[in-house]
């Protein structure tokens, strides 16, 4: 029955996407769009080879050697991206052993949401995904490559790279991760320190010491937020070397896995990206998201990725998959363990093995790990090891090594996935329930309406919020201010919840993938900038957030006939004006052209 249900969901998406998918494939494989170094003029070719070693110029210029692009998101500001500094040299060296070469075709921007969290720079975050996609396309537009490597890990970077890569879906492509940092202080201790600071129990110096014990090394943050959810999705889509996501950057195995990615692409056996990414692989990513309790941000990113290859995914599909897929993992913020502990007790190989065994994952997809004898997701049920300096794969563990972190399908943490879609007279919203205790999943309380995140924080500081309430924060959607994450609210709302108050958040903005314990109806659509119902809410309105029953409503008789709250009239009138400072004015056109959260919050208008 589950397999039948999964097939039904897939068929609905296939039918819905028939015209757009056909058009995407037609454009992608149009002969006019294929790599054409052989037909370039001699001056053009000379520009291609000018910076290359002398002995490679003629072989590459005459296409006697394969030439691959490297699109890198390397910088020193992101702990997860600093390891990419040396990856191009590792890739080039390995390719030389296979009569091939690679060029760094483009560097793309990569910002750290952990740095900008709660500040104005966060308003660039979502649209940085689109800038990364555009930058990726610019790098590949020389149109002289036989394939491409994509080096990226963090929140907006992987979705942006993949959206850009799909515009060159005729190229064989491999995504290369850097892995998580080694474990520092436990994530729950970090969260407690933040709450203690918010309540005035510890000082700034004490908090900084704790934070630096948590974020202390190269690699991704160790909680299961958007960055690590990205890595999971790349595995489930078959774009990583198998089970390379959660190997630490300085583990000797990491270097060998990077080299293996080069071997795979040089082999010529990796299919074009457009043939790897289809309805099944996208659904596999969504299944992985639900089974592991991944980030809410992918209710935006996965839709945007799908649209970039002609597949029309929507929140109803998320809801259907959530109702079908059990929750198999408890990784912070859904539990106390981090991704290193998750990897140690079985990791993604075990999750994939369990889902395949129960018919809850599409096995017959193409991946970069396909061989003549074995194709599909079975290749991702194996774990990499180093033996005598050689990469070997062994079957995943037969049972979880810690059932507090990872469980089989027969004994899940919950029968349903980690995300739900809420519906009601406010519109549609997303909620992550995997980290919310049962007693907090339903809240009925009076609204307190805020104009800004900073107003909330100030009123909390002044002890004005110590009561039951639903915080309402509109004009945080894509068209309003770029849809920043509002993770700073989590600490304060969590502190109030721990004091015994019934609290919740309703917003058209986003939360971090690290957010969790407080019930939050986010990505509310339509957003305030599109005259969504959220801007009709007034202080004192009774709101019910009922996650178990997928409901979100204002319980006031006059609500649906009511006009806009006068508090927001000025905000609504000024939406088309640029917001100056920190480069935000440069993003005005992206903001004004953005589509809805349920359409992926994209700014370059891919129409479906």
UniProtKB/Swiss-Prot annotation:
It catalyses: 6-phospho-D-gluconate = 2-dehydro-3-deoxy-6-phospho-D-gluconate + H2O. Its EC number is 4.2.1.12. [4Fe-4S] cluster binds at residues 154, 221. One of its GO terms (molecular function) is 4 iron, 4 sulfur cluster binding. Its cofactor is [4Fe-4S] cluster. Keywords: 4Fe-4S, Carbohydrate metabolism, Gluconate utilization, Iron, Iron-sulfur, Lyase, Metal-binding. Pathway: Carbohydrate metabolism; Entner-Doudoroff pathway. Catalyzes the dehydration of 6-phospho-D-gluconate to 2-dehydro-3-deoxy-6-phospho-D-gluconate. Belongs to the IlvD/Edd family. This is Phosphogluconate dehydratase. It comes from Helicobacter pylori (strain J99 / ATCC 700824). The lineage of its organism: Bacteria, Pseudomonadati, Campylobacterota, Epsilonproteobacteria, Campylobacterales.
